[in-house]
């Protein structure tokens, strides 16, 4: 019976390991044991220096999903593929439950169908400025221009609210609650 397993691979080698696993599967007659290999990715829109660029990002860096019939032979085959670290579960691979599989596959399909905005800043969000004259200042987002990849932030300078305009998304980061020390 085929079940889904999560396999840890070397980070930044996910595509290479997936291809090696697929090629080796075909050449070594393991097609009856390994049904499908998925590398969960999503398309992310990044804006840097005013340019929009769609890039592929791994949903789970360092992991592949493998649908397989687990036997000693198939386990050893996958485990010995170059770039594979281990099965989730360690010494004894643990299959994903049906609910987990359904949730994961639905999530992957939803992310395949569109492009995700990398930065999801909203008016009222607290951010820290990481670049420019106001580096390390923490403020509140007052305007967001998603089409340009820019925003405006209100910061407190000598007790007075001052607007910092034309910041690019990459120049700020969201501040977690409790992390604010102006």
Swiss-Prot record:
PANTHER family: RHO-INTERACTING TRANSCRIPTION TERMINATION FACTOR NUSG, TRANSCRIPTION TERMINATION_ANTITERMINATION PROTEIN NUSG. Keywords: Transcription, Transcription antitermination, Transcription regulation, Transcription termination. Signal peptide: none annotated. The gene is nusG. It comes from Chlamydia pneumoniae (Chlamydophila pneumoniae). Gene3D superfamilies: 2.30.30.30, NusG, N-terminal domain. GO terms for cellular component: cytosol. This is Transcription termination/antitermination protein NusG. Participates in transcription elongation, termination and antitermination. It holds the Pfam family NusG. GO terms for biological process: DNA-templated transcription termination; regulation of DNA-templated transcription elongation; transcription antitermination; transcription elongation-coupled chromatin remodeling.
């Amino acid at each position: 019976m085929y079940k889904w397993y999560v396999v840890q691979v070397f980070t930044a080698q996910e595509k290479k390991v997936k291809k090696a696993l697929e090629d080796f599967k075909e050449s070594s007659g393991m097609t009856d044991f390994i049904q499908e290999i998925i590398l969960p990715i999503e398309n992310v829109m990044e804006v840097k220096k005013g340019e929009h660029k769609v890039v592929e990002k791994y949903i789970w860096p360092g992991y592949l999903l493998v649908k397989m019939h687990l036997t000693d032979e198939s386990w050893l085959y996958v485990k010995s593929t170059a770039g594979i670290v281990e099965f989730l579960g360690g010494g004894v691979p643990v299959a994903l439950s049906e609910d987990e599989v359904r949730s994961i596959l639905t999530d992957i399909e939803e992310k395949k169908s569109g492009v995700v905005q990398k930065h999801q800043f909203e008016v009222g969000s607290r951010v820290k400025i990481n670049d420019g004259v106001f580096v390390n200042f923490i403020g509140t987002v007052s305007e967001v221009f998603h089409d340009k990849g820019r925003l405006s932030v209100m910061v407190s300078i000598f007790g007075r609210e001052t607007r910092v305009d034309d910041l690019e998304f990459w120049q700020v980061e969201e501040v977690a609650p409790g992390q604010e020390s102006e």
